[in-house]
Design a protein with these regions (language model features):
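Bacterial N-terminal signal peptides that target proteins for export
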Residues: 1-10
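Sec/Tat signal peptide C-region and signal peptidase I cleavage site
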Residues: 18-23
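Electrostatic cytochrome c docking/interface patches
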Residues: 29-56, 67-85, 216-218, 225, ...
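Acidic/histidine-rich catalytic neighborhood
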Residues: 41, 71-72, 85-118
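C-type cytochrome heme c attachment motif
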Residues: 56-67, 117-125, 138-147, 178, ...
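Acidic, glycine-rich loop-and-strand cores that form catalytic or ligand-binding grooves
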Residues: 137-188
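Extended, hydrophilic extramembrane loops/domains of integral membrane proteins
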Residues: 194-196, 200-237
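Juxtamembrane interface at the cytosolic side of transmembrane helices
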Residues: 243-248, 252-273
Length: 273
């Protein structure tokens, strides 16, 4: 009995120690803060001007290391960046892409891109193996980043996030914004407040003044991070506005159906009450 009690106390102390350790880890590893996004909530939509600025940041900064596996013509999306057909044609033609089929001599060759082509990988890293050999690990595909980097907000926030008129799902955008603004230790370009362990392989990619916005928006890190996070959210989920419209229609249908069933029940059973 004494041994059993001793073992129980030892286990309890160990569990308490682990709880304290985890609490300390959580305290040292803050979660990204919830940001305000035009596309969050039941009625959220993408801000076209913001997506165009975000694409500019991707093109001038992020594309040096990260691929973006979407076709050029996706940029014509009226619910997305909304570029014109001519703009997309000119953009695609400015890239050299590898042709799917060899020429008459059996040689693989490159040609100017067309709107139907996907964005090519960075010139320095034509494939994941080359990127991994140079960097130690292949940088993630930016078309998947916002979805892949979603995180749990914990209790009680996940309850509020699930409310019908909130439906907050933009944790991936929050994460991207947090990482880009988390390089807060002077003199250490690989220390990030929000990255697990605070050591990140990617040196700080962007600072104030790195990109001159075409629309005159202030060239500040906060704007860069917010705009590219919005663009990458669209790249990960371009059908978001349409999905939200469908969800709203379903909710309205269910409310009307519930009302009809309620009044039908009252009419059918009125003589028995």
């Amino acid at each position: 009995m004494i041994r059993l009690t001793t073992n129980f106390l030892a286990a309890a102390l160990m569990a308490a120690g682990m709880t304290v350790a985890f609490a300390q880890d959580d305290a040292e590893q803050p979660k990204p803060e919830r940001q305000s996004w035009s596309f969050s909530g039941l009625f959220g939509v993408y801000d076209q001007a913001q997506l165009q600025r975000g694409f500019q940041v991707y093109k001038e900064v992020c594309s040096n290391c990260h691929k973006l596996s979407i076709p050029f013509r996706a940029l014509e999306d009226p619910n997305g960046p909304g570029y014109s057909v001519d703009q997309v044609k000119a953009l695609a033609a400015s890239y050299q892409v590898t042709n799917d089929e060899p020429n008459d001599k059996g040689e693989i060759f490159k040609r100017p891109g067309t709107p139907a082509d996907d964005f090519p990988p960075p010139e320095s890293f034509p494939n994941d193996q080359a990127a991994a050999a140079a960097l130690g690990k292949a940088p993630p595909d930016m078309a998947e980043l916002a979805e892949a980097r979603k995180y749990e907000r914990g209790f009680p926030w996940f309850i509020f996030d699930a409310l019908p008129f909130d439906q907050y799902q933009e944790m991936g955008a929050d994460y991207i914004y947090a990482i880009l603004t988390g390089y807060t230790k002077t003199g250490d370009t690989q220390w990030d407040l929000y990255y697990p362990g605070h050591r990140i392989a990617m040196p700080q990619p962007i600072v104030d003044g790195a990109v001159d916005y075409k629309d005159g928006t202030p060239a500040k890190l906060d704007n860069y991070a917010r705009d590219v996070a919005a663009f990458l959210s669209w790249a990960s989920e371009p059908t978001l506005p349409e999905r939200k419209k469908i969800g709203l229609r379903v909710m309205i249908f269910l409310l009307v159906l519930a009302a009809l069933l309620y009044f039908t029940k009252k009419r059918v059973w009125k003589d028995l009450h």
